[in-house]
């Protein structure tokens, strides 16, 4: 299990069903982290994969090294645990959004929450994150129902 510090590029956290259909849970870019900390603490397997969306440069620590570091630095540990809770809340909010909002609403929420990523995330990945086909995303844009600017 790893602790990732993103220096350049974009990562995604994904889950896949047995047929290989992928659901993107979140994107993370420069200055952000991705982590398997919760699974490590709970002594469970990681229920998701962390993959590159774009060319990525990261700094990584094993979970053992990272936990040893934060144990020696209580303010860092406190901030880190807060960040982990925010990440988990973000994933929950995204999952709820997929169920409660229509396609234009999901796009609008992404634009509001992640505007800097719109031009950087490939449209195929964005469509997948929003639980849309790339064709539907393109059609919504063409018909003026969404604005990806």
Question: Residue spans of the language-model regions?
Answer:
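Cyclic-nucleotide recognition modules
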Residues: 24-82
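Short Pro-Cys-Gly-centered "Cys-loop" motif that presents a nucleophilic cysteine in a tight turn
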Residues: 82-83, 90, 107
């Amino acid at each position: 299990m790893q602790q990732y510090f993103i220096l350049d590029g974009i990562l995604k956290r994904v889950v896949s069903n047995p047929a290989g259909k992928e659901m993107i849970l979140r994107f993370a870019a420069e200055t952000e982290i991705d982590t398997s900390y919760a699974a490590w603490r709970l002594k469970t397997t990681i229920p998701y994969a962390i993959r590159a969306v774009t060319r990525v440069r990261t700094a990584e620590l094993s979970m053992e090294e990272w936990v040893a570091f934060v144990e020696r630095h209580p303010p860092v540990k406190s901030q880190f645990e807060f960040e982990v809770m925010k990440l988990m809340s973000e994933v929950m909010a995204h999952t709820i959004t997929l169920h409660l909002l229509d396609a234009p609403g999901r796009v609008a929420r992404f634009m509001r929450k992640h505007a800097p990523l719109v031009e950087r995330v490939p449209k195929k990945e964005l469509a997948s994150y929003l639980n849309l086909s790339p064709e539907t995303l393109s059609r919504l844009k063409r018909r003026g129902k969404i604005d990806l600017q």
